[in-house]
């Protein structure tokens, strides 16, 4: 019996020693952000909104989020005082005060007890910060089946607190996934095509044809893009791949496969559809440099840099693992790779070499979208 007690005691001491070796994260929720400082906002499992100080390349503060995690898409308010997060399994948007982590806003997309409505990454904040837009996909839940309903654009007032209800609602096209608000008050949203929407009456026009483009000697483009980055240069960019044929016969055996981007400048409304290179690998996200708009950077299994006008791959950097998001600091000389696991990889925009790493407390970032901003 004595030996058994010694074994139990030894096991208990061993467990305590192991637990004491684990990192202890202090409560940083009340740390106010500093004016003029640059930060990176990102989310990760199980319930974290992380604010990174890009000068020290460390976690500045962590806010706790309610509900089920996912997808964790982040959008920063124009005054840089609030972070909005798409959460609870795509069903709600939360608005957090960045200084105190206080939950100040909550919009639930479902509008009835027997309805389930989810937004597939599709929400945005107006340029004056007063309204939040979302296209969500409702279903009616019966006892033995679901009925798919018309997608809808919901408009919320960001001043309506924790029980925000739509102040306007309009039918929307199907398959809308990401969106950004423009300086002229309109809303651009990506679906089968990229649409320009009047948020007062719900009417829309095609700003950039995608599925329905009519480019000579091109096949239909393919688009997979779920990460709405708020960029310093006011670009709303989406990557595509497409076959480019040698002649009107459209022979796939002789076609070149091109990578390109659709772009809307949210300040001017100017649109662009442009190839930037051959398809040699797959990228989940890409951004043009804020320092040199002729340079395109892409990431998934490698980090790459392209000369857009020459349609030439300039550099490629091997990575420790897959990353989904590439984004710049405001100066355009550093790149942050986020998504998938719980580490942020930092790279030189000039050489693409890895120059740092940030380990996040908690679990994986998964398919979150990060944002860089100056307070």
Model-derived regions, located:
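Bacterial N-terminal signal peptides that target proteins for export
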Residues: 1-11
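Bacterial N-terminal signal peptides
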Residues: 10-20
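Predominantly soluble domains enriched in secretory-pathway, periplasmic, or organellar proteins
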Residues: 20-375
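Low-complexity, intrinsically disordered short peptide segments enriched in small/polar/basic residues
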Residues: 4-5, 19-21
